[in-house]
Design a protein with these regions (language model features):
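C-terminal motif of bacterial Sec signal peptides marking the signal peptidase cleavage site
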Residues: 20-23
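Bacterial signal peptide processing site
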Residues: 25-27
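Extracytoplasmic ligand-binding site segments that recognize negatively charged/polar headgroups
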Residues: 53-67, 79-97, 101-237
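A ligand-binding cleft/hinge motif common to bilobed small-molecule-binding domains
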Residues: 113-117, 234, 238-258
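Periplasmic-binding protein-like
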Residues: 151-156, 181-192, 213-216, 222-223, 253-278, 291-313
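A bilobed periplasmic-binding-protein/Venus flytrap-type ligand-binding module shared by bacterial periplasmic
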Residues: 158-165, 200-202, 268-283, 299-303
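Extracellular/periplasmic bilobal clamshell ligand-binding domains
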Residues: 314-347
Length: 347
């Protein structure tokens, strides 16, 4: 009888555990146990699990590229993703952890307060173990918080305009205060978004102490997300905004838009973590590792800051985007600011 390979043994072990769980009336997620051996054993167990699910607030086009790249690298593992806002996704993660009925395996968030709190507590996560985290180009010491949350990407926001309506464009944030743009500007509603609250406060700290109040006087259109602002800019529903990511993708598609990063420009990092409630714990580790590889970063970085150097399509380095001051973004402080904002923008 030929000797069994280590990979065959791992696959057999995972299958046996699954069979025992089913026989005992257990649910499918409980059948998958994390492997603590060599990385090849983790990958083999991940292939036996066969799928992995990502929750993310990243751009849907980049997530689709990530799915293609990941499945090219790991054809035996299907990547599924749910794209939503932090307001929608973070409570799901908390509920899945509390109930022990996980759907997501990896969670990618841009909410700095949630990230800081969860990284400190370690409640929702397990440590990523993939070999790519040791890559000097990634720089684990400045890219991982609390040994669990790892820097994956960053959004950098700037000025955007419709070139048909504004052929001369915008040179500085002050150009948005031109009375001719009254009612034609788009902004993001900060309701529930600590990061967006930080963005408005950044405007007043760095551009003009009264910039937000002056912007409100322009009677801008309000959108639930930066993606909605970009779509409105592309269609001509609005003609300018101070709250859009680099419109690299839109320009490549022929949209009549342009953009500029002012000095300074506001940004917010994306951190990811392997969920303790992951129904596919080994596939979760494989996806986490892939996210910080060159292939993973290339898929995620069109119009964003990358966590590795020299990534095609990236507009900056994610490690250069400061983490927001979460002490100024407590739930009470965010609620108070949102009330102030509503008084200015929705009166």
């Amino acid at each position: 009888m030929p000797a069994l390979s280590r990979r065959t043994l791992v696959l057999g072990f995972v299958a046996a555990v699954a069979a025992m769980s089913t026989a005992c009336g257990g649910s499918a997620p409980s059948a998958n146990l994390p492997v603590s051996g060599e990385w090849a054993e983790v990958v083999a167990a991940a292939e036996a699990e066969g799928s992995v699910h990502l929750y993310s607030t990243q751009h849907p086009d980049n997530l689709a590229k990530l799915k293609t790249a990941f499945e090219r690298k790991y054809p035996r593992i299907t990547l599924e993703f749910t794209r939503g806002t932090d307001v929608e996704i973070n409570p799901r993660v908390e509920t899945e952890h509390r109930t022990g009925r996980g759907t997501a395996d990896v969670h990618m968030t841009s909410d700095p307060v949630w990230t800081a709190t969860a990284a400190e507590s370690g409640t929702y996560s397990v440590e990523p173990v993939g070999p790519s985290f040791a890559d000097p180009a990634y720089g684990r010491e400045r890219s991982v918080r609390g040994d669990r949350f790892f820097l994956t990407s960053a959004a950098v926001f700037g000025l955007g305009w419709n070139t048909t309506a504004l052929p001369r464009g915008l040179a500085t944030p002050a150009d948005l205060l031109d009375p001719a743009l009254r009612g034609r500007i788009g902004v993001t509603n900060p309701s529930g978004f600590a990061a967006v609250v930080d963005q408005y406060q950044f405007f007043d700290r760095n551009w003009d102490p009264d910039f937000t109040e002056k912007l409100a006087a322009q009677q801008p259109r309000i959108y639930p997300s930066a993606l909605g602002v970009a779509q409105a800019l592309n269609s001509g529903e609005i003609v300018a905004t101070p709250m859009v990511q680099p419109l690299v993708r839109e320009q490549a598609a022929g949209a009549p838009v342009d953009w500029k990063l002012p000095g300074p420009a506001w940004g917010t990092p994306w951190y990811s973590h392997v969920l303790a409630s992951a129904p596919h714990p080994n596939a979760a580790q494989v996806l986490a590792d892939f996210l910080v590889t060159r292939d993973g970063q290339t898929a995620l970085s069109t119009g964003y800051a990358a966590a590795l150097p020299d990534i095609e399509g990236a507009v900056a380095r994610a490690q250069d985007v400061p983490f927001p001051d979460t002490a100024a973004l407590t739930p009470d402080a965010v609620t108070r600011y949102q009330q102030t904002w509503q008084g200015m923008f929705q009166r």
